[in-house]
């Protein structure tokens, strides 16, 4: 990585996970953390300041090799900024899969996933089907899913059905405008998360 603005976290085997972190523009006792998980190109362009959120944008490769580092990073940032109980996760496409996975593992308040694949094919991932992580006894984030409107049988509907069977809150009623640029879509999602946080 040649981007001098990127920070990184490293494990005992010198595996590095690069990321950007932008603290909220205002100082307050209640500043949640939002983790933005998207593909590498979008992660590079999503470095913007948002008044009421701490923004963590990992630049990562998908797969098991970075899962533990990403969990460590989320925990570390949340502790440093005293927002362990106020974590929100957003991702689109493959980043939507990661958002659901990391939201579950970090016990986030809410996850927004835009057209996420739920069942991964041709992968060595131990979480090849995210519905296997659901159960009726553990606590889970509230899931806000936006699927493919042209394909009602997509993975989003499959995951939503599994959530409902396990008594987990899931909503399919909010989709940002897909024709907008990524930063605009993210701001739309953050405004939505603000409304969700104010209701809790």
Where are these regions (language model features)?
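Structural motif
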Residues: 36-40, 60, 92, 145-150
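Short, surface-exposed basic-aromatic patches at helix termini and helix-loop junctions that form
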Residues: 49-50, 76-80, 102-109, 160-165
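Alpha/beta-hydrolase active-site loop
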Residues: 62-82
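Alpha/beta-hydrolase fold nucleophile elbow
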Residues: 82-93
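Glycine-rich nucleophile elbow surrounding the catalytic serine of serine-hydrolase chemistry
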Residues: 91-101
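A conserved short beta-strand
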Residues: 107-122
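The feature captures the conserved acid-bearing segment of alpha/beta-hydrolase catalytic domains
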Residues: 121-199
């Amino acid at each position: 990585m040649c981007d001098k603005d990127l920070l990184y976290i490293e494990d005992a085997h010198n595996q590095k996970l690069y990321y950007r972190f932008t603290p909220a523009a205002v100082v307050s006792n209640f500043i949640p953390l939002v983790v933005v998980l998207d593909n590498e190109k979008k992660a590079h362009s999503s470095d913007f300041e948002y008044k009421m959120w701490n923004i963590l944008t990992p630049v990562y490769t998908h797969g098991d090799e970075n899962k533990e580092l990403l969990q460590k990073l989320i925990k570390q940032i949340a502790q440093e900024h005293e927002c362990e109980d106020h974590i929100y996760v957003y991702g689109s496409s493959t980043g939507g899969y990661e958002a659901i996975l990391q939201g579950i593992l970090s016990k986030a308040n809410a996850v927004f996933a835009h057209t996420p694949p739920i069942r991964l094919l041709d992968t060595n991932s131990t979480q090849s089907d995210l519905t296997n992580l659901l159960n009726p006894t553990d606590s889970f984030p509230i899931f806000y899913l936006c699927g493919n409107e042209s394909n009602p049988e997509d993975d989003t509907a499959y995951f939503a059905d599994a959530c409902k069977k396990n008594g987990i809150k899931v909503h399919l009623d909010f989709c940002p405008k897909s024709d907008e640029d990524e930063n605009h879509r993210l701001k739309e999602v953050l405004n939505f998360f603000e409304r969700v946080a104010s209701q809790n």
